[in-house]
Amino acid sequence: MPSRFIPHFSNILSLYTQIKSRWQETDILIENRCGSRYRGGRFLISTAPQIKELCAWIESEHLKLRIAFDIPQLYTAHQVTPKRSYEICALLEELKEIRQYIGGVHIWGKRTSHSRRISHCGDLNTYFNNDMQLKAAFLDSLGRLFSDNQVRNLVLEVNSHSEDLCSIIEDLNKAGVSYV
């Protein structure tokens, strides 16, 4: 059992037990995070190895917890940039072994404005700097990651236009990602 999670999650396990005993069908998800602007401390679950470690702990404790998989945050944690774009697909492939623990997908666009990248704006075209080959490779990898016929919760955080939101949904549909 990965001991580094015990001090952080043991405090909330009693709350988890209370919720699950009263509302058995409730899905509880834990999201990975890696914020460059967050100043309140370090996140426990940011990288692919940390996500896999958490899933091993969930399994060892026989918990019905799952992951809300924030894909852009994973890329931030691994410092994936357009120059290191080969890692985009490799990271998704690496997480295939724990996909049964992924209960939700958090995805958003990103676009350039006044020489800096703005999160939660734009669609996947602008997220990948209009590199359609890279976007297609990402969507293909995402489709393979989730080719297990499991329906997942979809959390889209797009603060720009509804066209951007619809564009992301259309891309996910084309990739064969099943979601609610």
Where are these regions (language model features)?
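Active-site acidic/histidine proton-transfer and metal-coordination neighborhood
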Residues: M1-R66, I168
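Hydrophobic faces of well-ordered beta-strands that scaffold small-molecule active sites
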Residues: F5-P7, I28-E31, L65-D70, G103-I107, ...
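A structural alpha-helix within SAM-dependent methyltransferase catalytic domains
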Residues: L13, T17-K20, K96, G143, ...
